[in-house]
Amino acid sequence: SLLEIWNDKISEIGALIIKNRLEYLEILKKHAYKIFSEISGGNDELVLNYNSSISKNLDFSTPVKEIEENFRSKLQKLKSSELKCGSTLCGAHKDDLDVIINGYPAKNFASQGQQRSAALTFKLSEAIVLEEVTGESPVILLDDVMSELDPFRKEYLINNMGSRQVFIT
């Protein structure tokens, strides 16, 4: 049927997207954990987890074929529910990144300063990964970043931009 053709395609392409996200997250984590620890003065711990709607047991080492098989299986299990609601209930578009600070979900329990520190950590980590991949330093744009940072975090940010081109408003 037409639905099976679509499910095969979304499983194939979705598995590649998920695999690439998992691999990227593994690289990003290496930088993010270090930066977050430094920016918080060693007082806070950051954990990043890829929350997949396909399977809870995925990581960067999971083969893409296994992800694709899990995806197909999940689509088969959800087939009647998806037909009722008229949309896909699982896949890369439904996945999320869990940001955990000191053992608690950042979206619910982190202070504004911790959330801001996490956001800065992502920006700095992304810049480092881009530099490693492309060999070029990206331009970093930071809007209203200093207003919610304490003096220690402000100093850290300024001192750790290195030779990057940064615009702060």
Please describe what each predicted stretch is:
Residues 2-139, 148-152, 156-160, 165:
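Conserved NTPase motor "head" modules and their coupling/switch loops across ABC/AAA+ ATPases, GTPases
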